[in-house]
C-alpha cells in the first residue's frame, strides 16, 4: 500500500506546502501568476484591439474540409505586432480595403484557433468605426475618406 498524504495534528504545513507546489502543474494557475496573457498575447490581456490592414489573405481550411477562409493580415496599433484575423460572413471581405482601421476581437476558445482555420485567433468586428455586421446587412455605409 502507498503512503498517501500525511494525516496528523501537525501535518498542516506539510499539506499546504505540497498543495502550493502542485498548483504549478495547473496551466490556468501558472498563466495567471506568471502574467503570460500580458507578456505573450498580441492583445496584451485586452478583449479588443485596433489595427491597420496590411493585406487580404486566403487561409486554407484544415482536413477534412476544403475551403479558402477569407482573412486579413493586420498590424496592431498598440504594439506593432502582426496578426491574422478572420473576416466573418459571405462577401464581407469586399468592405475591407488595405490601410483601413479595423477593430479585432478574440475568435475561438481561450486564445486558441477556432474550427478548421489554422493559426487564426482573431476576427474583424468593425471597419473604419462601423460594425461589419451593419455593413453586411446594409444598415450602414462605410465612411468615405
Swiss-Prot record:
Protein's UniProt name: Small ribosomal subunit protein uS12
Coiled-coil annotated spans: none
PROSITE patterns, A to Z: RIBOSOMAL_S12
Similarity field: Belongs to the universal ribosomal protein uS12 family.
Biological processes per GO annotation: translation
Claim: tRNA processing is one of the keywords in the record: no
Keyword Cell inner membrane part of the UniProt annotation: no
GO cellular component, one term: cytosolic small ribosomal subunit
Hydroxyproline: modified positions: 64
Amino acid at each position: 500500500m502507498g503512503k498517501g498524504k500525511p494525516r496528523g495534528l501537525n501535518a498542516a504545513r506539510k499539506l499546504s506546502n505540497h498543495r502550493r507546489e502542485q498548483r504549478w502543474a495547473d496551466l490556468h494557475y501558472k498563466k495567471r501568476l506568471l502574467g503570460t496573457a500580458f507578456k505573450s498575447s498580441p492583445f496584451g490581456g485586452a478583449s479588443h484591439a485596433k489595427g491597420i490592414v496590411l493585406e487580404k489573405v486566403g487561409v486554407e481550411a484544415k482536413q477534412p474540409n476544403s475551403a479558402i477562409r477569407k482573412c486579413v493580415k493586420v498590424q496592431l496599433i498598440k504594439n506593432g505586432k502582426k496578426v491574422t484575423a478572420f473576416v466573418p460572413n459571405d462577401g464581407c471581405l469586399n468592405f475591407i480595403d488595405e490601410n483601413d482601421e479595423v477593430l479585432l476581437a478574440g475568435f475561438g476558445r481561450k486564445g486558441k484557433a477556432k474550427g478548421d482555420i489554422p493559426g487564426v485567433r482573431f476576427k474583424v468586428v468593425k471597419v473604419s468605426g462601423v460594425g461589419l455586421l451593419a455593413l453586411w446587412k446594409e444598415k450602414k455605409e462605410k465612411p468615405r475618406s
